[in-house]
Amino acid sequence: MAKLIFLTGLAFLLNAQLGSAYQLVCYFSNWAQYRPGLGSFKPDNIDPCLCTHLIYAFAGMSNSEITTIEWNDVALYSSFNDLKKKNSQLKILLAIGGWNFGTAPFTAMVATPENRKTFISSVIKFLHQYGFDGLDFDWEYPGFRGSPSQDKHLFTVLVQETREAFEQEAKQTNKPRLLVTAAVAAGISNIQAGYEIPQLSQYLDFIHVMTYDFHGSWEGYTGENSPLYKYPTDTGSNTYLNVEYAMNYWKKNGAPAEKLIIGFPAYGHNFILRDASNNGIGAPTSGAGPAGPYTREAGFWAYYEICAFLKDGATEAWDDSQNVPYAYKGTEWVGYDNVNSFRIKAQWLKENNFGGAMVWAIDLDDFTGTFCNQGKFPLINTLKDALGLKSATCNASTQSSEPNSSPGNESGSGNKSSSSEGRGYCAGKADGLYPVADNRNAFWNCVNGITYKQNCLTGLVFDTSCHCCNWA
C-alpha cells in the first residue's frame, strides 16, 4: 500500500478509484504517555497493522532547526520506528508544530531563505537519524493567530523548497524520497488566509484536512464536533462548518481529490446545558463540560471516556441531518463520532474519490477495548474495514496493545481482566494502584470506584514503594 504514495498522475488516480490506494493516517500524541491509569499510551500500544501511515506529534523548533520536545522523545522515536519491523509497508512521519506551538517560530523561520535552508537541512538530518519517512507540517495557521499575511505565500515557498530538497537528497543518496505532508485548516476563513491551494498541492504528497472542532463550548450552544453535513437551521458562516463543505472547498479550489485526506476525530466536545430539558443541537450552554478522568481537559473527551459516559446512563441520540451522534445526561452534553458515523463518512469519502482518512488521534480510540465493548481500536478498525485495508499482510502477533508497563511507569501494564474480577475491592478507595495480596505480579487498578485486575510484564513485580511495576 505505502509504495503507492510515490505514484502520480493517472496511475495514482485509477488506483484510488479502484479502492486500492486509500490511506489511513493515524496521529500519535507524545503527551498521551502522561495520562493516568488505563489512559496512558506509548508507541508500544500501537497495533502496527492498523494504519498505513503513523505520524508522531509533535516536534519543536529552535533557531530555525527542528528539535525534540519531550524529555524521552528519542526513546519513543525508537519504539515508533520498531513498528516497521512488524509491518514493512508502514510509513512513519514526524509532525512539527501543533496548536500549542503557536505561529511565531514558523514565521521567523520562513522569513528568510537562509532560515528556511537551515530548517530544511536540519529536518533531513533529523528524519534520517531517527528513522522517519517524512515530515508533516502542522502550522496552525499561516496568516492567522499572529502570523502575518505574507506567511500564506511563504508557506508555499517553504513546502516547495522542502519537497525539492527531499528530491535532491534522494537522488544523491539513492534512498527513497522523504515524504512531505501538511495538516491544514477546515475553517473557510483560515483556508483563505493561509493557503495557496493549487501551488501547495503540487508539492505536498498528502493534505490532511482537520475536519473537526467545528463546534465547541466556545460558542455558547451545543454543536457537533465533526458533522458530515450542515444542520438544517444553520445560516451564514455556520453553513461552512461541516466535513462536506470543507472538503469540497479544498477540492474545488485546486487540490486533487486523491491527495485530500479527511480528518476523523476519535474524541468529542462536551458542554454544560443551561437547561437539562433542552438537550438538542443548538441548545444554550453555560460553558465547557467537565474534564475526563484520563484526558483531563475541560470540554474534551476521548472516545473511550464517552463510552464510559454512555455506560453511566447517558442517553444517546442520532442526528440524521448531520449523520453523527450526541449524548446527554442531566446538564452534561457531548457531540462526537462513533463507529456508525465513521462508517458513513468513510462511504462518503469513497463516493467522492478522496484519498483516505486521517485520525486524531490513535491514543484517543478505545485502544484497550475496555470501555466500549467493541474490541480494541474500534473507530480505526471501522475505517480500516470500510477502506478495504483489512487484507493487508502484516504480522502483529507479538505486538502488545495493552496499557504500558515499565520500571517506574505508574500506569502499570499487562493483561487486564474484566472489572468483575475483584469486584468491590475499589469501593471507597481513591483512584490508584494497589497490590494483590497473593500475587506479586498483579495489582488492582481503581478508577472511579471500578475495579480492574492487571498484571505487570513477565519478570516484573508490583512495587508498593513507587506503586509501579519494577524489577523483582
Swiss-Prot record:
Pfam families: CBM_14, Glyco_hydro_18. Residues 400-421 have a biased composition (Low complexity). Optimum pH is 5.6-7.6. Residues 22-390 form the GH18 domain. GO terms for biological process: apoptotic process; chitin catabolic process; immune system process; polysaccharide catabolic process; positive regulation of chemokine production; production of molecular mediator involved in inflammatory response. One of its GO terms (cellular component) is extracellular space. Its EC number is 3.2.1.14. This is Acidic mammalian chitinase.
